[in-house]
């Protein structure tokens, strides 16, 4: 997983949590 990256879904976060508010991986 990684954090701080832009995302639209958890798939784009390598299954990390994707914040829908900021659209970033956390």
Curated annotation (Swiss-Prot):
GO terms for molecular function: toxin activity. It is found in: Secreted. Its main location: secreted. Expressed by the venom duct. It comes from the Eukaryota. Disulfide bonds join 7-18, 13-25. Keywords: Disulfide bond, Knottin, Secreted, Toxin. One of its GO terms (cellular component) is extracellular region. The presence of a 'disulfide through disulfide knot' structurally defines this protein as a knottin. This peptide corresponds to allele E1j. Has not been merged with other alleles since they may differ due to geographic variation (see strain in PubMed:19606224). Belongs to the conotoxin O1 superfamily. This is Conotoxin Eb6.17. It comes from Conus ebraeus.
